[in-house]
Design a protein with these regions (language model features):
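Glycine-rich phosphate-binding loop and adjoining helix at the ATP-binding site
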Residues: 102-123, 127-187, 192, 230
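Short hydrophobic beta-strand segments that form the core of ligand-binding sensory/regulatory domains
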Residues: 83, 135, 206
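Glycine/GP-enriched mid-protein hinge/lid loop-to-helix segment characteristic of carbohydrate kinases
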Residues: 174-261
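Structural motif
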Residues: 86, 137-140, 198
Length: 267
């Protein structure tokens, strides 16, 4: 029985993955996509429809008047993601549906960000029982959910925030560099791409190469602010000085030159 239940869970996951492109699918379409047997697909699709995870679209008639096969689509409101963008003095909180549409937004001012305060923010937001995943973006370098250095938020340095969140709330969690989270949203739509952010603490960047985010060995990729702008100062040092007496066009141009010579993105 345990093995049978495990196989069913695997097949269910495979079928759900066939909907992640948000296309309309008949049971025959799903059978072709997944290479599962039609009886297996039919039974699990019916269960998913009853559980409101997918929706059956209204019956349609073919051109000859005959009944067409029912089509199914993912219920975009079945599951929400709780997304936190953590900065030095505030936390932005988004709840998004499966179609990446904003359900709600909040900005919480905090003078001293810490893991405890992040957990409290999450606790107030997961009262919505549709939240099935948590994503936290941190400025700095993060590896496997462990924060090596949080830019301007020293209290988070060395914190295994991913594990702390999962252990407290038992919800699938991802903690990563904020720019890496941003670029991952374009993974399916674009080819090689570089995203650049110019902030108070210096520039950051993230990349997709050959359709996949560049993660690096220890999460330090994209920290271009530590590169030298000239023989005396880094890009980050100039930012911390308030970009005084700096031609921003030249600043961005030099930054782009470093990125292009390494990544050579399409966009």
């Amino acid at each position: 029985m345990a093995f049978s239940s495990m196989v069913k869970d695997i097949n269910r996951k495979i079928i759900l993955e066939s909907f992640w492109d948000f296309s309309r699918n008949t049971k025959q379409d799903i059978t072709k996509k997944t290479e599962l047997s039609f009886p297996t697909v039919s039974k699990l699709v019916d269960e998913l429809n009853e559980q409101d995870i997918i929706h059956m679209l209204s019956d349609k008639r073919g051109e000859t008047g005959g009944r067409k096969a029912n089509e199914y689509i993912l219920n975009q409101e079945y599951a929400y993601s709780l997304c936190l963008k953590v900065e030095r003095e505030y936390i932005e909180v988004f709840i998004v549906d499966l179609y990446k549409q904003n359900i709600s937004y909040d900005k919480i001012e905090e003078k001293a960000i810490s893991a405890e305060k992040i957990l409290k923010v999450i606790e107030t937001k997961i009262l919505n029982n549709k939240i099935k995943s948590i994503v936290v973006g941190i400025p700095g370098f993060i590896h496997d959910g462990i924060i090596g250095m949080a830019d301007g938020i020293e209290a988070l340095n060395g914190c295994n925030l991913k594990t702390e969140i999962f252990q407290k709330f038992n919800i699938e969690t991802e903690v990563a560099n904020n720019m890496n989270i941003l670029v991952s949203g374009f993974q399916k739509e674009l080819g090689d791409i570089s995203c650049i952010h110019i902030g108070k603490n210096g520039p950051g960047s993230s990349y997709i190469v050959n359709g996949k985010p560049v993660s690096g060995a220890f999460g330090f990729q994209g920290e271009v602010g530590f590169n030298f702008y000239d023989e005396h100062r880094t890009f980050r040092e100039i930012a911390l000085e308030g970009y005084q007496n700096i031609d921003m066009i030249e600043y961005i141009g030099r930054l782009l030159l470093q990125i292009i010579t390494v990544i050579n993105p399409y966009k």
